[in-house]
A protein has these predicted regions:
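Aromatic sugar-binding interfaces of carbohydrate-active proteins
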Residues: 2-15, 27-34, 40-171
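Short surface loop/edge beta-strand patches of beta-sandwich-type extracellular domains
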Residues: 21-25
Length: 172
């Protein structure tokens, strides 16, 4: 089954942190950065989904790390009903235990202008209703590109250097 909306976590929308990522902000989107996604479990049960970033050799914790992306967080989100119906964090943890294939893609959104991701109308970011359309992007950047590199997987905290303070709460 497909869960189109899933359970999302956007620092701008869900953590009231509009100054977290963007040009010149805490995660400066004009420079390369690494995205770390962790799936801590306790006794084999997924407890949360943790996101952090590494930029210029510095580990940057997610905005307002006291807000935990756990089942309670997901259940409170409008549009995440199917996520819970399909098993929520328990179902996600079970699926991770069975094994998954990583798939990366680029979304060239000619109909929605990526409003779900960073649009002001959706409350997800500062972008206006038209600047996310591919034709508008190509006016600014003639040949936009993205690079996926140095993809790693392993035990939590083993794929990057730096502090892993977020994990202390799951080891209790």
């Amino acid at each position: 089954m497909c869960d189109k909306n899933g359970c999302g976590d956007n620092p701008y929308k869900h953590r009231s942190s509009p100054d977290y990522y963007g040009t010149g902000l805490k995660v400066d989107t004009t420079k390369p950065f690494t995205v770390i996604t962790q799936f801590p479990a306790k006794d084999g049960v997924l407890q949360a989904i943790v996101r952090k970033y590494v930029q210029d050799g510095v580990v940057i914790e997610n905005a307002r790390k006291e807000i935990i992306m756990d089942q309670e967080f997901c259940s409170a989100q409008a549009g995440a009903e199917m996520y819970s119906k399909l098993g929520g964090h328990k179902g996600m943890g079970d699926a991770l235990a069975r094994g998954m294939v990583l798939a990366l893609s680029i979304w060239w959104d000619e109909s929605g202008a990526m409003q779900w991701l960073d649009g002001s109308e959706s409350g997800s970011g500062p972008c206006n209703a038209t600047e996310g359309f591919p034709k508008a992007i190509q006016q600014i950047e003639k040949a936009p590109t993205v690079t996926f590199s140095q993809i790693k997987w392993g035990e939590i905290g083993s794929t990057f250097a730096g502090s892993n303070s977020t994990m202390r709460r799951w080891n209790a």
